């Protein structure tokens, strides 16, 4: 070794050049995927290209639970509230997830409204062209129907308006992370503290 150069420390195998991963097929793969998408769109016509309608859900864990995204499927409760039978839903392009549970009224109402909006825009083709059943769309609607490309009923993330206020010394001294930790600790010990307080009250009465 001489001069101020990097000390070589490459941990290579003896014939490492024979095992280098190449990506020469990348442009062709891109073309192949595009053609496959076009073929699928033709095959599933007149259904939307992006698949069935999915619900709006909140992400899991403390990091993501403030963000909304599309979920796997609508709950049976949501379908019932929107007046859609659970057996019919998958046949008209609505994803169903029997395992998911509604944990808030707001979430339930949002998805019920989403389903109702979808129903108003839905065009149902008859299974057999000559046998039109109840619930199928009119011939005029069928003639004007087009295949939806890309996302439909996209999630609109509203940005809250910011209100500018003057900084006070109290605001500057406030430690948000410490406050969150304190409140989380209080929540964790709430049951034990309540029990201890009840026992102390019982002792005083004696």
UniProtKB/Swiss-Prot annotation:
Where's it found, cell-wise?
Answer: Cytoplasm
GO annotations of cellular component type: cytosol; cytosolic large ribosomal subunit; cytosolic ribosome; nucleolus; plant-type cell wall; plant-type vacuole; plasmodesma
User: What's a BP term from Gene Ontology annotated to this protein?
Assistant: translation
Main location per the UniProt record: cytoplasm
Pfam families recorded for this chain?
Ribosomal_L13e (PF01294)
Q: Where is this region: Disordered?
A: 185-206
Spell out the Basic and acidic residues composition-biased ranges.
196-206
Query: Which GO molecular function annotations are given, in alphabetical order?
Result: mRNA binding; structural constituent of ribosome
Domain of life where this protein originates: Eukaryota
What the entry lists under InterPro entries is as follows: Ribosomal_eL13, Ribosomal_eL13_CS
Per the record, where are the segments of Basic residues compositional bias?
Answer: 186-195
UniProt keyword Ribonucleoprotein, yes or no: yes
- The entry's keywords: Cytoplasm, Ribonucleoprotein, Ribosomal protein
Q: Indicate the transmembrane segments per the record.
A: none
Similarity comment text for this entry:
Belongs to the eukaryotic ribosomal protein eL13 family.
What HAMAP family does UniProt report for this protein, alphabetically?
Ribosomal_eL13 (MF_00499)
Q: What's the protein name? A: Large ribosomal subunit protein eL13z
Organism annotation: Arabidopsis thaliana (Mouse-ear cress)
């Amino acid at each position: 070794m001489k001069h101020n150069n990097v000390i070589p420390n490459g941990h290579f195998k003896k014939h490492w050049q024979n095992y280098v991963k190449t990506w020469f097929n990348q442009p062709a793969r891109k073309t192949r995927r595009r053609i496959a998408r076009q073929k699928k769109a033709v095959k599933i016509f007149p259904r939307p290209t992006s698949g069935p309608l999915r619900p709006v859900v909140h992400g899991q864990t403390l990091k993501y639970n403030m963000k909304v995204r599309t979920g796997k499927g609508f709950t049976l409760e949501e379908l019932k509230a929107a007046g859609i039978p659970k057996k019919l839903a998958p046949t008209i392009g609505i994803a169903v997830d029997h395992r998911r549970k509604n944990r808030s009224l707001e979430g339930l109402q949002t998805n019920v409204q989403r389903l109702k909006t979808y129903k108003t825009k839905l065009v149902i083709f008859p299974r057999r062209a000559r046998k039109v059943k109840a619930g199928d769309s009119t011939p005029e609607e069928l003639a004007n129907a087009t295949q939806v490309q890309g996302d439909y009923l996209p999630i609109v993330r509203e940005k809250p308006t910011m209100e500018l206020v003057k900084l006070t010394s109290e605001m500057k001294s406030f430690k948000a992370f410490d406050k969150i930790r304190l409140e989380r600790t209080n929540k964790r010990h709430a049951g034990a503290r309540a029990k201890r307080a009840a026992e102390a009250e019982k002792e005083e009465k004696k």
